[in-house]
From Swiss-Prot:
Name of the protein in its database record: DNA-directed RNA polymerase subunit beta''
UniProt KW keywords: Chloroplast, DNA-directed RNA polymerase, Metal-binding, Nucleotidyltransferase, Plastid, Transcription, Transferase, Zinc
Binding, Zn(2+): C220, C294, C301, C304
Biological classification of the source: Eukaryota, Viridiplantae, Streptophyta, Charophyceae, Charales
Gene designation: rpoC2
Cited Pfam families: RNA_pol_Rpb1_3, RNA_pol_Rpb1_4, RNA_pol_Rpb1_5
Cofactor section: Zn(2+)
Highest taxon in the source lineage: Eukaryota
Enzyme class: transferase
Catalyses which reaction(s): RNA(n) + a ribonucleoside 5'-triphosphate = RNA(n+1) + diphosphate
Family: Belongs to the RNA polymerase beta' chain family. RpoC2 subfamily.
Quaternary context: In plastids the minimal PEP RNA polymerase catalytic core is composed of four subunits: alpha, beta, beta', and beta''. When a (nuclear-encoded) sigma factor is associated with the core the holoenzyme is formed, which can initiate transcription.
Compartments (UniProt record): Plastid, Chloroplast
EC number: 2.7.7.6
The keyword Cytoplasm appears for this protein: no
Amino acid sequence: MRQFKEIPFYNQIVDKGTIKQLIGRLVAHFGSTYTSHILDKLKELGFEYGTKTGISLGIDDLLITPSKKWLIQDAEQQAQASDSHYNSGNLHAVEKLRQLIETWHTTSEYLKQEMNPNFRITDPFNPVHMMAFSGARGTTSQVHQLVGMRGLMSDPHGQIIDLPIQSNFREGLSLAEYIISCYGARKGVVDTAIRTSDSGYLTRRLVDVAQHIVVRKTDCKTHKCISIQPFLEEWKMNIHLYVQQKLIGRILADYVLKDNRCIASRNQDISFDLAIRLLSFKFQSIWVRSPLTCESTRWICQMCYGWSIGYRNLIEVGEAVGIIAAQSIGEPGTQLTLRTFHTGGVFTGDIAQQIRSPLNGIIQLNNSKIRSIRNRYGQPAFVCLDNIHIKVKGKDTYQSIIPTESLLFVKNNQKVQAKQVIAEIRSTIRQSKEEVNKNINSELAGEVFWSNKYYFKEQNLHDLQKNNFFVKNNHNFRNCPTSDSQNENDSNRSNHFLTINSIKYSQEKTNWPISNTGHIWILSGQVYKFHNIQSIFYKQQDKVRIKNILAQKELLVNNGGRYHNFHSQRLSYFQENLMNNSYTHSKKKTKSLSSNFVNNAICGLTILKEKKGKFSFLKNSSFCKKTRTNLQFILEVKNYSRIKHNDLLATLHNPAHRTSTAGMVKYGFLLINSQLDKNLKSYNKNSRKKKISLYQNNQIQPGQSLFWIPEEIHEIYKPFSFLHVKNGEIIQKGTYISEDIQCGTSGLVEINKRNRNHYEISIQPGSLYFLKDKQIALQKDQILIAPGEKIDNTNISDEWLYLKYLKTDQGVSVLFARPAKEYKIDLINHLEHASSLETLYMKKCFDVRISHYTPYEDGQKIRNNAGAQLISASLVFKLNNQNLAHKAEISWTRIKFQRKISYYLQINLRDKILPYSYSLSELKKLKFNSHFSNKNKQINNIDEVILGDTIFHTPLLTKNYGCIRTFSRRRQDNKTSFVLLSSSDQLELPLPIIFFAFISYKRFFNKKLGLIGNLYTKKTKLRNSNQNLFLNLFFISWYIIDEYSCNFLFWGAFSQLIKDARNKYSHNCFPIIIKKAFFSLGKFLSKIEMKILGNLETELGQVISLCNKKIILRIGKPYLATRGAIVHPRNGETIREGDTLMTLIYERLKAGDIIQGLPKIEQLLEARRENVVELIVNRYFLDCTNLLTEELGMLLGSLWGFQFSAWASMERSKLDLVFEIQQVYRSQGVYICDKHIEIIVRQMTSKIIILGDGMTDGFLPGELVEIPRARKTNRAMKSIMFYKPILVGITRASLNTRSFISEASFQETTRVLTKAAIKGRTDWLKGLKENVILGRLIPAGTGSEEIILQRLMNLQKIEKLRKGKSKKYTTSKLDSLLFSKCKSAFLKRHPLNPYCRETFHFILKQQITNSF
């Protein structure tokens, strides 16, 4: 009789886990029958005492932890500190979110940990406490939501909502908390109705893929195995019991040795006691057998499977473990959806392992092994470069070893308190991370400025240096891109404001990667952005009032016709008269007169002898993008020549508008003859007249298109008999037209006879469409059709086509569709220029426009195979008001800079204009008030208008009083922006008493200098080394930042900067030293500097004004940008509130599917492309290949290295897939045995895909074949079959089996049966499903006749070996009885034909003999 060990006596309070262990031990010792009797007694005992106790559950039983109040207050203080650091620019948005999550998650976890001691102390028999902490019903997390706090929630996508729910269900939720709570929750009714069907379908697919897996033999004799790493698994799941459950029931694959002592032997099953013993020895890895490594082809052996979960013993031969595995995985799929968080997706996680100081003392460590970094929460820390020893010296001495790559929060010789966190251990587990982009939106409207720490990455410099744009170099904005407005202003300023060979940038670039951590400032201001502005009435530094007109929009005529028109072409004026300004320009006296009238639009009627405007076509034209690709205008005028209205200045031949073949031109528009001035300048050269004529007649308007129908044309000067092609013949590319001419394209041949022995042969590419209706074909003859239009009743074009009607010799109507290429002219932006008017308003008297024209007529054929310039562009001189000036003079300057030659044009108006003054009454007579009238106003006057005329104007008004700070104009998209700086955007602070420096004042001038203030000489005496740094410097009392430029220079009467020769500070302004802090013009003040000024508010900003007693700041907000962040606006550009400022790129751990559990399982089991396992396989293959190439390349060779890498990566993918599936289930409290998942994964990874083009091996390319079958084929065939392993989903694996009956019963029945009939496939009925379909007994089960026969054979083998007889088989009574039983059992199951019956005796005897 079997002797059992003594069962230990349990005298403790048991919970759910202890009950499981107790039942397992009872089954192992007494069997299932006796165990069920014991459990019945235990159940009756529980019901009896439960009834006597009278346990009930009420709302009063929900006791709230007393420590909740101060824990939440502490968390709120930490959250406020994070907000303060974020507003000061010390943290960015991601670090702030991480700190918030860490703070509230830690608070929630501490509150959860306080629940159990609180219940034990106050009410140990509390029903909620007994129910939850025993595991009878509910979890600790759910009770925590009842009596603690709900904490952080996650939305349906798994993202954490940064607003924690501080209340619990006992206290009740507020409206906002309830909405957030419901956002992550799911409805139970919908979930039950929809998700349960998905779970059932998952079970069906799993059963189909694994139904034939049956335990057929005892041992497959394999030496392959997998390793279980106890400590790694423990870190993964953080549950020691999980490792025991993975070990219990497994079979050891090798001997386990400890100090040359055998702990366990090969093929020994791991019991509960052995598992505890193995874990106690702390082995790094334990090698066990697994279904993944079983050598059996279509089934599995007993040793590789291990224990039966139900009986705690080895699985019996004949068990259908495939169906058991499918049901064990599919059935909890219902639980995945039904027992998920109906109360919402509560964020749960583990607190990082931290090391705390056990006592008060001083830290001692080696500084050479640490390096300062910024941790993921934005806090300063130190990373350990190696394992370091740390000591805490106090009353006692505490020593510890900090592993490498851990984080230290203390430094050497620092005092620490008891329980203070001194280090954080980095996890050694390879955690799956994903890269996330976080868009940061601006919380302030204004201007964008980059700090001086930003530099481009080295790999971007080569691309950036190709462009012709300079950047100013000042002490606050270095080596960063500037806006277009700064480039415009720079062209009119002196050269010492520019830094040559500085970092350049491309105007097309909209994303700027940051290589160093720094700040991006947004300075406050009201932003006005306009599109398609024709008239702008203000410049920088102009002051405006409320509802002043900033600019105006004009509605232009797009087509000719009769429109409502205004009589007056003049602008309205201000109410006040401006002063007459006299100035000297080029030694000629000029006067200007401006007036102000009722509608607040600034305008000026100017009396002048000379007016200059400079143009830089290289830098400021709308063709700047094309100019950067080395496109250049060809000047058509002489230097210092006179020009008139509508004269051509230069032409441009764009290669993008040049064709590469011969062909035909078709207009995609109705030709509009330009209304040019009749008095065009006459030129001596004929080419000049020809270009003017072409410009007049064939001008192309913006938005119009030309079409090019390509063809190939050859001229043959030979008799017709020498031609190798016929008219109407379709030839291919490379066909010889004659003996020495070969065509370069495919198409239809058209032969035209010019003269005798002179033929023109045209090869026209295209397609032929036969039409029955001749009238329809004639209607579509010689027309263009757009993409998406019908060619005939059945065909739709996918590109521009040119249709041509043809008729065959048989009289059939054919449409010949030839491809047409579109050349479209984009909308034209007028060139900007700077003027020298000295009034507040600058009105354009002239303009230079770009006009496009074509030299070819509609339908004209170009016979040159080299192509032609289809469209040309011209610069045309326009006078906006011909009453002011009639003639002009043009000159150009040739400038060479850095091996590049640029031409700058200058146009001077030469005609003298008589002064004229309008009175208010005269302006009213001229109806100036109607100029800015509402666009909905009915206008009675009707006049004939043409293309380009203005119908009416729309004014754009200001909203507040202030000063224009920035004027930016971008030509690419015709956008104009202003920043209006008002009093609400500024902050005035008094300067405190100066303690650090002793300053004496001496009045130098008593005269007031307006905004500049008074002039003083200050003698500054400084202590220590700075004593003589600022002695006897020439200071200005009041400094104002130059609002016109981004360089922080002075403007006004005294702008000279005098510095001491020994001054080492590279500031462009005089600093004021207060309490060891420098306050200089243009400086961005930090929070510490604001506290020195006495400002306790949160506003930060930039110094724009300094005086003796006060400092004026422009309010701003800093944003921290870390390395790798992408900044969208350029430096100096405007941004509105809510616009995207930058994109932070950071890594985060991939969140488990808290809500979407079942779809995650389907994604893994179906091996979809977004599967994480596929990415892991590819990365592991590359890593393994590199390792083998470097270390074992000479030994193995590259071919064997790749083969080994493929095998290793596929083996690794199996384990990763098992872990990913297990992780989803365990995240929701469902435990599934690893062996069951391994059986399914084995079926998913047991196939290969055929490679190659031929069929020499009997398989088609792309066909799925089992791995053993492919290896047998390779051994049998002379030619090697190439294949690669593949990860197949369960649905695809079910449709690629050896049984076509099983495949047809699953999906695609017609296709599977048809394919099987064509191939003549044979189904050997080896699976369970096909036998059930045909009504046969299934070949599985411990009581099946085949299994009984196998057992008898094994018993006979054991008996023979025990008696020591020879292996030769001898007949005896036992043998005869065994033979007869096997024969009867086999013939009952398989009704064989006579041939099989005759050979059965020999086959059965041979099998029995071989088994011995």
